[in-house]
């Protein structure tokens, strides 16, 4: 049973690789951004709460994101495995997830760190041509990633769950290395 958590800086290719691998393994690619948007669109109780934060320009609180992730991992299609993308972002969320997976008998997860150099990530994100992706904004997002999310690398490394993949490679090379490393 495959349970993977994808980490890496913005522009490292997490979403792309998670989707490719999820299709290859026939398991759901669970993106926290997607489940948040879906819950708001469907006006679920959690979605209504989240919408109030989004409408007021605030970050959705950790507890609400954790509740959404828990709800999603309890769905039938996630019982045979999953790939999480965009969660956890902090060590406190990782501890929550670890406890949740133990409680639900879904342990054995592995963590894929798509490690990409800042200059590579900046070039990739600038090439997307989004007007809000200026070099200054991208470098700020990288700073936030390094300070908030990077401690997860140590957290999972200490638990011998971390696989690091060179995210500087082409999409095809990363996919090949991922499949080879995971034996899929």
From Swiss-Prot:
Q: Localized where?
A: Cytoplasm
In which residues is AMP bound?
32, 37, 58-60, 86-89, 93, 130, 141
- A GO-annotated cellular component: cytoplasm
Q: From the record, what ranges are coiled-coil?
A: none
Q: Could you tell me which residues belong to the region LID?
A: 127-133
Instruction: Specify where the region named NMP lies, as residue ranges.
Output: 31-60
EC code(s) of this entry: 2.7.4.3
Q: For this protein, what reaction is catalysed?
A: AMP + ATP = 2 ADP
Q: Which positions bind ATP?
A: 11-16, 128, 169
The pathway where this protein functions is: Purine metabolism; AMP biosynthesis via salvage pathway; AMP from ADP: step 1/1
How does the record describe its quaternary structure?
A: Monomer.
Per its database record, what is this protein's job?
Catalyzes the reversible transfer of the terminal phosphate group between ATP and AMP. Plays an important role in cellular energy homeostasis and in adenine nucleotide metabolism.
Domain comment, in the record's words? Consists of three domains, a large central CORE domain and two small peripheral domains, NMPbind and LID, which undergo movements during catalysis. The LID domain closes over the site of phosphoryl transfer upon ATP binding. Assembling and dissambling the active center during each catalytic cycle provides an effective means to prevent ATP hydrolysis.
Could you say which protein family the record assigns here?
Belongs to the adenylate kinase family.
Official protein name in the record: Adenylate kinase 1
Q: Which organism is it from?
A: Nostoc sp. (strain PCC 7120 / SAG 25.82 / UTEX 2576)
């Amino acid at each position: 049973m495959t349970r993977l958590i994808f980490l890496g800086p913005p522009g490292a290719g997490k979403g792309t690789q998670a989707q490719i691998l999820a299709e290859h393994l026939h398991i759901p690619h669970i993106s926290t951004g997607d489940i948040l948007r879906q819950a708001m669109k469907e006006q679920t109780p959690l979605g209504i709460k989240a919408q109030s934060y989004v409408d007021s320009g605030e970050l959705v609180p950790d507890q609400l994101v954790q509740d959404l992730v828990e709800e999603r991992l309890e769905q039938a299609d996630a019982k045979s495995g999953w790939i999480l993308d965009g969660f956890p972002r902090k060590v406190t969320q990782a501890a929550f997830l670890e406890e949740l997976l133990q409680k639900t008998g879904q342990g054995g997860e592995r963590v894929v760190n798509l490690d990409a150099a800042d200059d590579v990530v900046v070039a990739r994100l600038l090439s997307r041509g989004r007007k809000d992706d200026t070099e200054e904004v991208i470098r700020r997002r990288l700073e936030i990633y390094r300070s908030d999310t990077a401690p997860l690398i140590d957290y999972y490394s200490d638990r011998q769950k971390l696989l690091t993949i060179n995210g500087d490679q082409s999409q095809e090379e990363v996919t090949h290395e991922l499949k080879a490393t995971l034996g899929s």
